[in-house]
Amino acid sequence: MLKLSRVFLPVILFASCLGAYGQQITKEELLFLTPEWKGERFPDGRPKVSDAILDRMKLVTLEEAWAVLRNENYKHQYDEGWMTINPDSVLVGRAVTATFVPGRPDIHRVIDEKGHSKEKRVKSQNSWTIDMLVKRDVYVVDQFGAHEDGPTIGDNLGNSIYTKTGNGVVYDGALRDINGLRDIKSFTSFFRSYHPSHHLNNPDGALNTTLVGINKPTRIGKATVMPGDVVLGRDGGVMFIPPHLAEKVVKTSEIVRLRDMFGHQRLREQKYTPGQIDSRWSPEIEKDFSAWLNEHINDLPVPKEQIQELLKSRTW
């Protein structure tokens, strides 16, 4: 009996993964998995970090975000080693996740049947998650690093993704039609490789990819990603920020940014030594920093109301 349970347990777990609505997560599951998010949500339960926070996130560096997450014990939210489209741009948005596995005919058939007949999905599985995208989403795909015969995204779907979201993708696999994708304005994307082939999705013939998860927890390289995470892609790396920590990441980054600007200016003026700026600031330097904030409040790359909030919290 024990041996049988070991055999059937993975099957039972996989069946439960498909859930009552096929491979798409239910609202109840998503609420259960994101209890620390207290803000607005999409109708399906996905956390909806505000547009204002997303706007401010564009100036956050990977180092700043990494430090905040590390201090909160989130140690597996970053991955690197990407090829990029628009490498000098920053990708920010709310994650919508898709998980593919190497194609398996029996699973593929029942997912196709349920998707087409009961969920009214159209065409092949590689477009199903894309049909759900909205503005400021980022399509995050675990394509298990598939290379030859692996690409599920080319310039046709790329145009659809960009039209729906205004963003590019994070794609753990190969893309195709790279020239066409580069022609899409602001399609800032991170992907593993390029190959001119395309995925194969015929369960009665050539098949190499099957979609088993929509908006479920997924793995991208060394990172764990949840739907609704804030995606921050820049400088060759991608950070996946839990929604309940997004505001803290932004505010911490803004404080660091302002202190760096002040410190660099004072060093150029030779008012303080590098040792004074690099160590814990004295009360005199902190007072000077507050005065500098007030003096330049309309010219700094941080919202004025955020600087005012910072000044109110200071005691010097």
Spans of features found by a protein language model:
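Bacterial N-terminal signal peptides that target proteins for export
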Residues: 1-9
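Boundary at the C-terminal end of the N-terminal hydrophobic targeting segment
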Residues: 20-22
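Active-site and channel-lining beta-strand-loop segments
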Residues: 38-42, 218, 231
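Buried hydrophobic positions in well-ordered alpha/beta secondary-structure cores of metabolic enzymes
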Residues: 45, 161, 229-231
